[in-house]
């Protein structure tokens, strides 16, 4: 079982506005807080967002080796669409809008969002209609 994920970000305040907002609306609770970062916990798993002084670059590129994206379950299509609608006010942009919500295939109801720092999340509806 996954224990935790730690994301190093170039700007903590931007990350808190986008990733922090998303984690909280997905049910994660603030777990730890320090000058350079925060963590959120859901059950035994926690996610860390940190602006480390040891960063060697000032931007994230999901197409480089390393983390491409994080994927989260949401309850259903209605919840997913509400999150997509609200996400723009929190620094997120819908990817593949011309294929939304089936960019991952006709049996995969999901939204792909990218924040201003280039981090991608995939929101996957657990209960959703299949595209016909």
Q: Where do the model's predicted regions map?
A:
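Core segments of cupin and vicinal oxygen chelate
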Residues: 8-51
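Short glycine-enriched loop/turn motifs at secondary-structure junctions
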Residues: 1, 63-66, 105
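N-terminal beta-strand motif that seeds the catalytic metal site of vicinal oxygen chelate
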Residues: 1-17, 70, 127-132
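Short beta->alpha transition motifs characteristic of CBS
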Residues: 104-106, 123-130
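Glycine-rich acetyl-CoA-binding "A-motif" of GNAT/NAT acetyltransferases
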Residues: 120
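Vicinal oxygen chelate
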Residues: 9-15, 71-117
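Long, continuous compositionally biased terminal/linker segments
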Residues: 42-75, 79-82
């Amino acid at each position: 079982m996954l224990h935790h994920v730690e994301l190093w970000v170039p700007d903590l305040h931007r990350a808190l506005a986008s990733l922090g907002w998303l984690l909280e609306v997905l049910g994660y609770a603030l777990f730890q807080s320090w000058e350079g970062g925060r963590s959120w916990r859901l059950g035994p798993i926690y996610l860390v967002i940190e602006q480390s002084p040891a960063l060697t670059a000032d931007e994230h590129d999901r197409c480089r080796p390393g983390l491409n994206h994080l994927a989260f379950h949401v309850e259903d299509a209605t919840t997913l669409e509400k999150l997509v609608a609200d996400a723009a006010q929190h620094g997120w942009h819908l990817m593949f809008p011309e294929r939304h919500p089936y960019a991952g295939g006709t049996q995969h109801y999901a939204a792909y969002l990218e924040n201003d720092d280039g981090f991608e999340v995939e929101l996957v509806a657990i209960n959703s209609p299949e595209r016909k």
